[in-house]
């Protein structure tokens, strides 16, 4: 029997397929351009497949996926898919752990859509589509916000008018929780400890840090939205909120237009004026491009600043600093540049270990380092599949 993991947006469905018994991933892929002309379904199985198929909505995409799974002999029939686990960005404050999918859970996700208008609606469309396409399957959800439900009031509150904050539900929610939780569980196994204290640096195009104490999130850099925190690929991270008003007045721009700039044209892309892909910016850095050097130094400093704050929060017993996600796992340059800017402890990277390709995980610090530094590959899909299995065992 199989477990299907779904991560859906408004016009796409990313998926991964796992064997239920041993949780081995056997396939992955994406259905793109749902509701748009020239739809494409890509599947990686025994080889890479690509199909040009128009899909008018998520239900048609779900049905086409199942047909193609049978066509390429990934499954014999749809009944082999016993469990489906969905990634949902926002569960508000009510959904604080992976949950079986029932009408109450769906209602909470619908209610939380106002906090994640770009993400939750697509997930809901996919949930409803697979309920119809695979009526026998048992469904569960993992929330990106859930791991951060352990953050206390001091750390999740914003110093704005209290009545307004209460009325509108304005607080830090945090994101990337599935990844932060996966890394927490993995570090426990690596260190053979029942609980761990560490700072996790999930650095991809989107990026967030998490302070983990006794294996629970006590603070995280993203906030009410994923725009908060450190500088990212295209997102600004933290800025003075009055910049909004100033730019809108000076440029005769709407709040929505400037918020879009902060989300899509800022960060590494906006500062470097080169690309949101760090590899391109690193290449220009090596060639002495002044704007690339400035962008990467600013980026590294923003990450180091948050890391230092979080090391202070989890002290005195600090088990590790962990780098994960696309940049964290693959950029030796960024890891070195960030660690060199953290001065509160003597943290030393082993140049050779930091430079080599990382497998599942790698210790990259020296024996003299006061805090061990690891690179650990994250696997959100495996976390979702594992939870789906546990919830339905």
From Swiss-Prot:
- The UniProt annotation places ATP binding at 14, 202-206, 277-279, 326-330
Task: Report the coiled-coil segments.
Answer: none
Biochemical pathway = Metabolic intermediate biosynthesis; acetyl-CoA biosynthesis; acetyl-CoA from acetate: step 1/2
- Cellular component, GO annotation: cytoplasm
Q: Where is this site: Transition state stabilizer?
A: 176, 235
Active site, UniProt feature: 144 (proton donor/acceptor)
Q: What is its EC number?
A: 2.7.2.1
Query: For Mg(2+), which residues are the binding ones?
Result: 7, 380
Please indicate if the UniProt record lists Magnesium as a keyword. yes
Which terms in the Gene Ontology molecular function aspect does this entry carry? acetate kinase activity; ATP binding; magnesium ion binding
Q: How is the cofactor bound?
A: Mg(2+). Can also accept Mn(2+).
Question: Entry's Pfam families?
Answer: Acetate_kinase
Q: Which domain of life is it from?
A: Bacteria
Q: What SUPFAM superfamilies does this protein's entry cite?
A: Actin-like ATPase domain
**Subcellular localization, as worded in the UniProt entry:** Cytoplasm
Q: Spell out the reaction equation it catalyses.
A: acetate + ATP = acetyl phosphate + ADP
Residues given in the record as substrate binding sites: 87
Complex and partners = Homodimer.
Q: Which family does it belong to?
A: Belongs to the acetokinase family.
Q: What does this protein do?
A: Catalyzes the formation of acetyl phosphate from acetate and ATP. Can also catalyze the reverse reaction.
Name of this chain's protein: Acetate kinase
Organism lineage:
Bacteria, Bacillati, Mycoplasmatota, Mycoplasmoidales, Metamycoplasmataceae
Instruction: Name the gene behind this protein.
Output: ackA
